[in-house]
Amino acid sequence: MKLPITLLTLAALSFHSLAQEESLTPIFNGRNLDGWNTDDALVASHWLISDGQIIGDNPDKKGSVLWTKANYNNYELNLYFQTDSPDYDSGVFVRGPSHQVQIGVSRSLKIDLTGCIYCPKDLQGKYPIQSDKVKTTHKLGEWNALKIRVINNRIVTHLNGELINDYMTAAMPKEGPIGLQVHAGVHQKMRFKNLEIQPTRYDEPGVVEPQYDGIPVPVPNGATVLFDGKDLSLWRGMPRKGVENPAGEVRWKVESGFMQVTPRQGGITLKEPLLTSGHLHIEWATPAEVTDQGQGRGNSGVFIQGFPEVQVLDSFNNKTYHDGQASALYKHAPPLVNASRGPGKWQKYDIHFSRAEVENGKVTKPAYLTVYHNGILTQDKIPFLNRAQNGGLSLQDHNNPVRFRNIWFLPTE
């Protein structure tokens, strides 16, 4: 059943409302390290239990990580940490060793990164550096409350009740263990207690009535038309695996005011970059004849300025994974709701994005991405720290003859 929805209702939807939360469960019983890997010699010599606390102590200045035996996917982790060490470098690894929530002063960057995300091998390139809130929120020598929320490729941290970081990674493992670290190079004694985890899962996005009738939207004053329905002179072709295209030949066809993907011949990309923040409007339609299901049904995508793919898919009565539906940020964030029209019907995306602001190599304002699908808010100002700003705009060939029309860009800078 489709549900009526209003802008007020949509404004009330949040990142937290996407997920159904289960009860909090201790991952440390306060007595021993049952449930933690203790086979490693460094673990045995560096970690102990006292007064209901896990204590990491490295007088030899060697590094060690205490890992859970269990792997975790999406969750909220709550814990307390404390140290009397004047110099310390610790952290909590999420889903294995690639992404860490830092505690203390980074040995490499020489600044307090508590609550920030340390992931130097992230495909985004640079990773978030110190949050100004750390300076006033982190209580040295006292117990600090750390909350870590991991949903798909997003990591959100709160320190003593204050939001410190909201970070969308380029890629991270689907699941993995949680690790407590004492870093090499400095003697430190880290204390952890009250470690509790709350697994989360996504519900199927609710189906709502689209607020779009399929009529082309007029181009506003000041907008640049990127496809007028006549030719693809502003675009060039892209190679794909097994298909060479050194000359950038566009192999899609144009007819009746729309362009159409030629399956397995490569996507297309705009020749000139979009160098400002702005509003991208694009209309699209999946094939009217349904010949497949899931990800094989009207699949394409919109890539803009290095943000994750805005998924194009026939999601009308079509079950698939939540972060692969129409208007999902593919494998990053599912849509708030499913606002899809039926197969063969024209649909529209209005994608609003702002570029990150950087001063002296430090991000002072993250990039943001908001998506409206058929007039309904489906991605609400998703932040991206240090997202590569390459200015590109590309449309994907995912083996389906998806159509596009009426593409324009309105700068907001």
Predicted regions span which residues?
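Carbohydrate-interacting regions of secretory-pathway proteins
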Residues: 20-413
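Bacterial Sec-dependent N-terminal signal peptides
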Residues: 1-21
